[in-house]
């Protein structure tokens, strides 16, 4: 099974990893909160390319930071982001310099994105579903209820719209295969 995220170690990961093996979630949350997404959020909400409102973007940033926190707490788990978090992650990756620096700050390594998880047949889809269920379980352990339409209304409903890529939450929609919904 391919993992959704893969890590490429930097030149000196041992001391970094040893430090975070003894860290608690508050310390990790504090480190994640040092990452500045203001430029990314401006692009998404105010630039000529803007497609999000500020409330949606703020919500996405909070959820993405939770995703990063979980990845730090459980580096061997294949987390599956929500569609909204996945979109924010994609935008973060596009700023390659900042993304690489942020990954090094948080993980001591580059976190690769594997956008094909769950599209290669039933077994791969089942692996995606199992990883998503584990993501929800660990999310709820650390942050409370996982965002749903009932809890977060339109923000979550917008986040759950059919997207034309397959690297986020499992879905029975045939759009899991790129181009199928067009």
List each model region and its residues.
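Intrinsically disordered, low-complexity, repeat-rich regions
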Residues: 2-182
């Amino acid at each position: 099974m391919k993992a959704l995220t893969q890590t490429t170690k930097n030149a000196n990961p041992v001391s970094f990893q040893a430090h975070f093996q003894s860290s608690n979630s508050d310390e990790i949350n504090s480190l994640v909160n040092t990452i500045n997404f203001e430029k990314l959020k401006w692009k998404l909400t105010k630039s000529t390319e803007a497609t999000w409102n500020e409330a949606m973007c703020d919500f996405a940033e909070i959820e993405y930071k939770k995703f990063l926190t979980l990845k730090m707490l459980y580096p061997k788990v294949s987390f599956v982001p929500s569609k909204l978090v996945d979109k924010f992650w994609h935008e973060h990756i596009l700023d390659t310099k900042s993304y690489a620096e942020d990954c090094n700050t948080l993980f001591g390594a580059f976190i690769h994105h594997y956008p094909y998880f769950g599209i290669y047949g039933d077994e791969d889809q089942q692996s995606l579903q199992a990883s998503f269920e584990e993501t929800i379980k660990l999310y709820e352990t650390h942050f409370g209820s996982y965002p749903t339409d009932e809890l977060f209304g339109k923000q979550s409903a917008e986040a759950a719209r059919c997207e034309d890529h397959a690297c986020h939450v499992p879905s029975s929609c045939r759009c899991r295969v790129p181009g199928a919904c067009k």
